[in-house]
Amino acid sequence: FNKFGKARLYYEMSLEEQDQLFESTKKNVLPTITQMNLKYAISAKNRARTVAGVSILSTMTNRQFHQKILKSIVNTRNAPVVIGTTKFYGGWDNMLRNLIQGVEDPILMGWDYPKCDRAMPNLLRITASLVLARKHTNCCTWSERIYRLYNECAQVLSETVLATGGIYVKPGGTSSGDATTAYANSVFNIIQATSANVARLLSVITRDIVYDDIKSLQYELYQQVYRRVNFDPAFVEKFYSYLCKNFSLMIFADDGVVCYNNTLAKQGLVADISGFREILYYQNNVYMADSKCWVEPDLEKGPHEF
């Protein structure tokens, strides 16, 4: 009887009906309600967590819209986002080797975002939606895409929440039960890491930089950030390869491990843990305590937690 749980209604729809529903979300905003539930788990920590159960209509239409990019994230190996990669059959070893390779004078560090789902700024959650939807250039018109964004914001960002008998409007942040939560958190994580590096590199006094290539990179970055209206894709590739070489990332939702070049970090050319703290403080409004982050100079020991 209950073989699909509460989702039974959706799964009994034919594929044509599912497509019709999806098409209607490109012209209308579906009104849905999200239910807040207390998470039931055995934990050493003395605290309650909540899980937001997003409506099946919202979940399925969002997944249908983002399906291509989500599948490509899941099926791509040796990329910064490791969602979908197995840790068995040598997968974990492979991920760590891939993280460390090519980085000179490597040091590992990791962090944990305090109150990640609750503290995420609305603008960054919207940005994550836009980044995930960036491939929809040929298949949808602009108005269809903007309605998809409206739907996603109405159902994930500031939707109506049913909590213990009262109905509230959520002020923002991520819904933990949304279909794209893990992916959006990963995008957010990459944005924070990149922001930390951009801020750190721009804050260095140019005459103190001993490497000429990094000096010119800093100048170009300054031009891109402060002088230009439209960014230069070639520079984005250049900066990306600089980060890959000196600030290698491994990301799973809001967890992350970084292998960075310690020589450059001491000169302030790539971000270290203090750079992360600063970015979190002014971009996420949370303070990251010592207990939330770790740095490990000895690669033999590996990451502390991931």
UniProtKB/Swiss-Prot annotation:
Q: Where is this region: RdRp Fingers C-ter?
A: 115-173
* RdRp catalytic domain span: 106-268
Q: Where is this region: RdRp Fingers N-ter?
A: 1-75
Q: Name the PROSITE patterns for this protein.
A: COV_NSP12_RDRP, RDRP_SSRNA_POS
> What's any GO biological process attached to this entry?
DNA-templated transcription
Q: Where is this region: RdRp Palm N-ter?
A: 76-114
Alphabetically list the UniProt keywords: Nucleotide-binding, Nucleotidyltransferase, RNA-binding, RNA-directed RNA polymerase, Transferase, Viral RNA replication
Q: Which GO terms describe its molecular function?
A: nucleotide binding; RNA binding; RNA-directed RNA polymerase activity
Q: What Enzyme Commission number(s) appear in the record? A: 2.7.7.48
Q: Which InterPro entries match?
A: DNA/RNA_pol_sf (IPR043502), RdRp_CoV (IPR046441), RNA-dir_pol_C (IPR001205), RNA-dir_pol_PSvirus (IPR007094)
What is catalysed by this protein? RNA(n) + a ribonucleoside 5'-triphosphate = RNA(n+1) + diphosphate
Region described as RdRp Thumb: spans on this chain: 306
The residues covered by the Nsp12 RNA-dependent RNA polymerase domain are 1-306
The top EC class, named as a word, is transferase
SUPFAM superfamilies assigned:
DNA/RNA polymerases
- Region named RdRp Palm C-ter: 174-306
Q: Which family does it belong to?
A: Belongs to the coronaviruses polyprotein 1ab family.
Job of this protein: The replicase polyprotein of coronaviruses is a multifunctional protein: it contains the activities necessary for the transcription of negative stranded RNA, leader RNA, subgenomic mRNAs and progeny virion RNA as well as proteinases responsible for the cleavage of the polyprotein into functional products.
Recorded protein name is Replicase polyprotein 1ab
Native species: Turkey coronavirus (strain Minnesota) (TCoV)
Q: Which gene encodes it?
A: rep
